[in-house]
Regions:
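Long, low-complexity inter-transmembrane loops of multi-pass membrane transporters
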Residues: 2-7, 199-379, 385-388
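Intracellular juxtamembrane helix-capping segments at the cytosolic ends
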Residues: 39-41, 46, 128-153, 165-166, ...
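Extracytoplasmic gate region of multi-pass secondary transporters
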Residues: 39-46, 229-241, 336, 367-369, ...
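Central cavity-lining transmembrane alpha-helices of secondary-active solute carriers
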Residues: 59-79, 96-99, 103, 163, ...
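Glycine-rich segments within core transmembrane alpha-helices of 12-TM secondary carriers
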Residues: 67-68, 145-197, 211-234, 426-427, ...
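Cytoplasmic membrane-interface "Motif A"-like loop-to-helix N-cap segments
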Residues: 79-92, 440-456
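C-terminal ends and interior cores of transmembrane alpha-helices
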Residues: 92-110, 197, 230, 459-470
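Hydrophobic core of transmembrane alpha-helices in multi-pass small-molecule transporters
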Residues: 97, 110-131, 474-488
Length: 533
């Protein structure tokens, strides 16, 4: 039994299995990272208990978005501390921030000043940036040849989190905002503490194999099944009013089983590793004396003394490619290394100059695809174009999401949980599809990923017009259409930024770009808050 246990632990720690264990754990953490999507579920109760008006509530929605997206500190620390420490900070901010909101809504403490509520809400939702940064940066480095696919899957599960939290709100919290906030205060940090050990950096594979591609397809397939299960349960809950019922709790249990279904990949890899190890032990040949390597009979004087030739010394001193060197310089170095007799034609000062240039490399700015620091990316037009496109796409989408309850009430819909579920599942499909489709076409047709951001924002115009038309049924269809287009922005922006500016400082660059979300929410929130005063 002890031998089997050691084999299992050795298999799990192996370079092939550990990245998949981390990815599966990251999927559940990404669901936790969607905790800011709970705001529509408790915002009305918060408004009633504290007596806020619509402008004050909309400003709290901005705090919700700022906390969700401003993660520069997490991006700065992701290269200095391990992923588990990043996740630990996220669990702590969730516990403190949502804990105070729970105490306020449950009327356990006296209502604090408005700015305190604003700050603690920002702190609680800021846990999302710590969760996102830890798992996204780690897994994109673990799977560098599948960045679009990995980003789409991870961001897709964040999009699904709204439907997951809605199911918890109906089945476990029994549509009680106080119980839902208690879950965010205690349950969310506890789940993070259980999973944070498994998210760790691993040595990436040299290339993407067909087996790895098949595993990604399996995760995508299970996530689609998971999404349609959530859609079905949301419709059943809405039609038959299953809150406070035994069936709704069964739905929640099945939901958690489907959430954990990708664990089949590391289990399969572990079983294969154990089986192969067992077969190797059985079939391993006995060591033979004739297998011992012998030294060559004839050894040169150079090998015995360990001395290096002048050509070898120059080849080590001179870099293979020096920034800014011309073709003549390359030819001279080549002749020196390949033909030592050519050294006689060089004067001693020229040799010293060549060695000096090799020892001190000339600095230059990074080019597209190389590793940029944030300050280097900030002076690039590509960076600001990507930021503005992301700002427009997610800003208008999050404006609708934050005002979904008010939009539903204005169109005669008392319960907006079904709208939140529809938006969440459509958001997931947009994130998953945007990552997979952009990855396929950038490889096969060399079509830039940003084409899909442009196309989705064009469709977004039609979605906003549908919501404004108030035609019968347009609210549901508009939410679905808007959710898909909204999700595409996330899954396309992430790999685009990594391919333009590299992975070394990706945490900082990613978190700066995501600030387009709260800035967009702040820019677009004034029209609706004036309408729904």
């Amino acid at each position: 039994m002890a031998g089997l246990g050691s084999r299992i632990m050795g298999a799990v720690r192996s370079g092939l299995i550990a990245p998949w264990v981390g990815l599966v754990a990251a999927l559940s953490i990404q669901v936790l990272a969607g905790n800011p999507y709970n705001f529509p579920l408790y915002s009305h109760r918060l408004k009633t208990v504290l007596g806020y008006n619509q402008v004050q509530l909309s400003n709290l929605g901005v705090a919700n978005d700022i906390g969700e997206n401003v993660g520069l500190l997490a991006g700065l620390l992701c290269n200095k501390i391990p992923p588990w420490a990043i996740l630990l900070v996220g669990a702590a901010t969730s516990f403190v921030g949502y804990g105070v909101i729970w105490l306020v809504i449950s009327q356990t403490i006296n209502p604090p000043p408005y700015y305190v509520v604003w700050l603690v809400l920002c702190l609680g939702t800021n846990s999302s940036t710590w969760f996102n940064t830890a798992v996204l940066v780690t897994n994109m480095r673990n799977f560098p040849f599948s960045r679009g696919t990995v980003a789409g899957i991870l961001k897709g599960y964040v999009g699904l989190s709204a439907a997951v939290y809605t199911e918890i709100y109906i089945g476990l919290a029994e549509k009680d905002s106080v119980k839902q906030l208690f879950f965010l205060t205690v349950g969310l940090p506890a789940a993070c503490l259980l999973l944070m050990y498994f998210v760790r950096p691993c040595t990436p594979a040299s290339e993407e194999g067909s087996e790895e591609h098949g595993y990604f397809i399996f995760i995508q397939a299970t996530s689609i099944v998971f999404a349609f299960y959530l859609l079905t349960t949301a419709i059943v809950d809405d039609v038959f009013s299953l809150d406070k019922g035994f069936i709704s709790k069964i739905f929640v249990g099945l939901m958690f089983l489907l959430l954990l279904s990708p664990i089949g990949i590391p289990l399969k890899l572990t079983w294969n590793a154990i089986r192969d190890d067992h077969c190797t032990d059985v079939q391993k040949p006995l060591p033979m004396e004739t297998d011992r390597l012998e030294e060559p009979l004839l050894a040169t004087e150079e090998n015995r003394s360990g001395s290096k030739s002048v050509a070898e010394t120059l080849s080590e001193a001179l870099p293979s490619s020096m920034p800014g060197e011309n073709e003549t310089g390359r030819e001279n170095v080549y002749l020196c290394v390949s033909h030592p007799s050519f050294i006689e034609d060089w004067d001693q000062p020229e040799i010293l100059l060549a060695e000096g240039e090799g020892a001190v490399r000339k600095k230059r700015r990074p080019r597209r695809g190389e590793n940029f620091k944030l300050r280097q990316a900030l002076v690039k037009a590509d960076f600001w174009l990507l930021f503005i496109v992301y700002f427009c796409g997610v800003g208008s989408g999050v404006m609708v999401l934050n005002n979904l309850a008010q939009i539903g009430l204005a169109e005669g819909l008392d319960d907006v949980t079904i709208l939140l579920s529809l938006f969440s599942i459509a958001n997931f499909l947009g994130r998953l599809g945007g990552g997979a489709v952009s990855e396929h076409f950038v490889r096969s047709k060399a079509i830039p990923r940003t084409v899909w951001m442009t196309a989705s924002q064009t469709v977004m115009i039609a979605a906003h017009l549908l919501l404004a038309s108030a035609i019968t049924g347009s609210l549901y269809f508009g939410c679905l259409l808007l959710g898909v287009c909204y999700g595409v922005q996330f899954s396309v922006m992430v790999p685009t930024a990594s391919e333009l500016f590299g992975l070394k400082h990706f945490g900082m660059i990613y978190n700066f770009l995501t600030m387009g979300n709260p800035l967009g929410a702040l820019f677009f929130f004034w029209p609706p808050c004036r309408v729904y005063l």
